[in-house]
Amino acid sequence: AGGIAEMAELGPEVRKTTDKLDSVGNTTAAIAKGFAIGSAALTALALFTAFAEEIAKNPKLTGLLVDGHLVVNLTEPGVIIGIFLGATLPFLVCAFTMEAVGKAAFEMIEEVRRQFREIPGIMEGTGRPDYAKCVDISTKAAIREMMLPGVFAVGAPLIVGFLLGAKALAGFLAGVTASGVLLAIFSPS
């Protein structure tokens, strides 16, 4: 809000009000991020607990239990592979997401340039831009570009579980939980 007020060359009284609004917005965003991180961490732990309970129900996998608790030897190669694969998945999804944002931004830039070229009067404020087209580009790009990260997030645990087994999947879930929570905490936005 403050930046818009400054670009519009509004008076200092307006800027004073928008600075307060910016401050409230930034505080709200920081609090919401904390809640999002906390809920994601609890959800990941709940999924890991559900995995452990399913192990307990499966007679073929009860060898992973000691006194009713899931126990995994961290020195086993399959478990180590699972941990490393799990620790890399949040970074892979993050990379795909950043690439998706970049592609969507370039599509938006091309559309805005096209509108400046083809719609007379936009720069002077007499012509009306096609806002709906920009919203349409954003929506379609978001859906299209986020499919691959979604497939990785859903498919990776299945692939690890079926190809490497339950012990590797336990390591995978531990790795993805630890690195995912840390990535969420230390990512700037």
UniProtKB/Swiss-Prot annotation:
EC number: 7.2.3.1
Protein role: Sodium pump that utilizes the energy of pyrophosphate hydrolysis as the driving force for Na(+) movement across the membrane.
Subcellular location(s) of the protein: Cell inner membrane
Summary of activators and inhibitors of this protein: Requires K(+) for maximal activity.
UniProt GO MF annotations: diphosphate hydrolysis-driven proton transmembrane transporter activity; inorganic diphosphate phosphatase activity
Broad class of enzyme this protein falls into: translocase
Family from the record: Belongs to the H(+)-translocating pyrophosphatase (TC 3.A.10) family. K(+)-stimulated subfamily.
Keywords assigned by UniProt, alphabetized: Cell inner membrane, Cell membrane, Ion transport, Magnesium, Membrane, Potassium, Sodium, Sodium transport, Translocase, Transmembrane, Transmembrane helix, Transport
Transmembrane segments: 31-51, 78-98, 146-166, 168-188
Cofactor annotation: Mg(2+)
Main location: membrane
Identification of the protein by name: Putative K(+)-stimulated pyrophosphate-energized sodium pump
UniProt topology in membrane: Multi-pass membrane protein
Gene Ontology annotations for the cellular component aspect, listed alphabetically: plasma membrane
